[in-house]
């Protein structure tokens, strides 16, 4: 059972790193497409990527770490504000 828990936690960590790499590549190459949903209307300030995605990445990191703690049997923590 411990081997299954360790493998699950390892897969979560690997998945998290793959997600981060894909997100970074997406932001670097695709955020300036004309039809991109997060693009600001003409004449407005450009989007600060750190502001747009910071909260969602924090929540995702919390969810991944919480799932890992649950798999390993550690106690839970509160989500970041």
UniProtKB/Swiss-Prot annotation:
Transmembrane parts of this sequence: none
GO cellular component: cytoplasm
Gene: NNAT
Organism of provenance: Homo sapiens (Human)
Keyword Lyase: no
GO biological process: brain development; positive regulation of insulin secretion; protein lipoylation
Keyword NAD: no
Record-stated family: Belongs to the neuronatin family.
Protein name in UniProt: Neuronatin
Keywords per UniProt: Developmental protein
Protein task: May participate in the maintenance of segment identity in the hindbrain and pituitary development, and maturation or maintenance of the overall structure of the nervous system. May function as a regulatory subunit of ion channels.
Domain of life, per lineage: Eukaryota
């Amino acid at each position: 059972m411990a081997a299954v828990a360790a493998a699950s936690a390892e897969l979560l960590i690997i998945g998290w790193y793959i997600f981060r790499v894909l997100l970074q590549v997406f932001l670097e190459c695709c955020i300036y497409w004309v039809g991109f949903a997060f693009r600001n209307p003409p004449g407005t300030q450009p989007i600060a990527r750190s502001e747009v995605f910071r909260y969602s990445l924090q929540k995702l990191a919390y969810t991944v770490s919480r799932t890992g703690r649950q798999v390993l049997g550690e106690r839970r923590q509160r989500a970041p504000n």
